[in-house]
Amino acid sequence: MTVLVSRWVGAVSLRYRLYAVGAPGQMRRMRRMVCMTISAASFAPEYAAVADAPRSDDYARLTRIRERLLALNYSYDAVQELLGVEAAEAMARDQVVPGLWRVEHILRGGYSAGEKNLARLLAFFLLARPLTEAEAAEVFGDTLVDFENAALIERDAADSARWSASVDLRPHAADDGTEIFVAADLGAHQRPGVLRKNHVLGIGHASLTLAQITERTPVKRALDVGTGCGIQTFHLLAHAEHVTATDISERALAFTRFNLLLNAQTLNIDPQNPQARVSLRMGSLLEPVAGELFDLVVSNPPFVITPRVAGESAEEQFTYRDGGLPGDEIVSTMVRQLPSVLVPGGRAQMLGNWEIIRDSEDLEAPRPWDERPRAWVADGGAEAWFIQREALTPASYAETWLKDASENRDRSHYEQTYVAYLNDFASRNVHSIGFGMIWLRRPTEATAAGATDPLQRFEEITYPIQQPIARALTGSVRRYDRLAAMDDEALLATHLEVAEDVTEERHGRPGAEHPSVILLRAGSGLCRTQLLSTETAGFASASDGELAVGQIVAALAMLLSWPEYDEAAAAARGTQEQHPRDTLLHAVRELVLKSFLHFSDEHAGAESAGESTAEAQG
């Protein structure tokens, strides 16, 4: 560390002497750059020059790199347009051949010099196409040495006359127009052999899913657990005053530091004081922030279930996906412990896996998928909403993750590890493995005291949904909170209306006087479908915001000849024989929670059943 500081001090004083003889304007600009350089150096300096990771120990160098990328028009839209739909979609599947074919077509065709250089650049960083000496000079110009010194590019190991990318460096765009550059390790489709154990994951389907489910309401303090290349932190900075990013990997924090400083201007980070908005900490799960409280926590934890090996060390594990614990314990640990770092009412969004156990009486059948997740929150320490998106058999799960790290390239190793996966799942009687989205909230004082019922929801939604769904989920939670504070009398006085994206479907036999099936469909968000009874169909049809719930219920009671409602008698009957009014009000609450119905005083369109402004795209 002393050597690093000395080098910084020496570099700064040398720069100042060189520019001390310049014009006054040059001197002012250089003093500002020196100040920024010193300040950037004091920001998590231990991650500025980590081996085999991008170097962020020279802010002036990062500025020149960013300016070169911008000059080359290296943007999300430009890359998509140059590649075309087919090649871009193939890249999303980690297939590089269509992209390489497209690039060669551009280089041979009548395209402009700028388009050809953009093609070379994207092929270099995204498709693992090396550059010749002449091409590198054309693409990088006088910043070639900056890219090399920042450990972004290197001489090709097989041919020193060529250059290869050391990292995957790509543009990433948010729907609000924000665009940044994100560096991560080269993926399995960009490099030979098995991934390195301390691989730093880039922008993938899981990270984008998490970004799309994360609530974007303004908060003071946010926490990103398992930051990786920093992608969640970058999105959090748009609505959090300060973000703490943690990871067990020193290399991951080095990538995050590099990306933060490379994009400091776009992310509204002052290079003279980065610590004002971001802090980086190394450690496992919540250990680095023990005793602290946050308004919002996001995490794409290393949740991949991996067979444990006796005597294995952390260096032998794929740290980007393997938390080192057996089964789904990494996710259960996170779910149980997250409330301890949340303020009352604070929320967390994360992704996870959970094991679904075989039924003891029918080994071919599973027990309920939510059995284990329910147990994790049974103590009431957190309100919870689990949405299972898919479930894989042990064999399919093993194949997915063996391929993910390119462990299928060595046949002997592949078969041996495949068997280990099957043995591991069999040892716990696992039928399948669920994957999905997790929303958590630390109960408020009122909820903890029992004044309102805690939100506990477990849904399986395996059909396509309209991402991003963050605002749809937020709207549902707000409606739940409002409903939870209402008894039936308050609900009867409320005005409801059908959400704008909801349509009704009626099905019946040809010639039949009445439909046999009536459905409501949400056209966005979670895209739910709800089967309606005659009563709920009638209620939905009359819910235009003008009539109170009680008025509609009274009209239905008369139309359907319900017996007179006696509150004392209803209480005596309990749940064994509910009055039609109670049944209907329960169904109405469910329609509101599922966002088919809205409170009529909600801001128009602000919280539709699926309305969601795109939080991220990539």
Task: For each feature predicted by the language model, list its residue ranges.
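Short, positively charged and aromatic/hydrophobic N-terminal segments
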Residues: 17, 26-32, 46
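Long, charge-rich, low-complexity alpha-helical segments
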Residues: 116-166, 211-215, 223, 228-231, ...
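SAM-dependent Rossmann-like transferase core, predominantly class I methyltransferases
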Residues: 156-222, 227-239
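S-adenosylmethionine
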Residues: 195-204, 216, 248-417, 432
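Flexible, glycine-/basic-rich loop-and-beta segments that form/coincide
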Residues: 387, 394-477
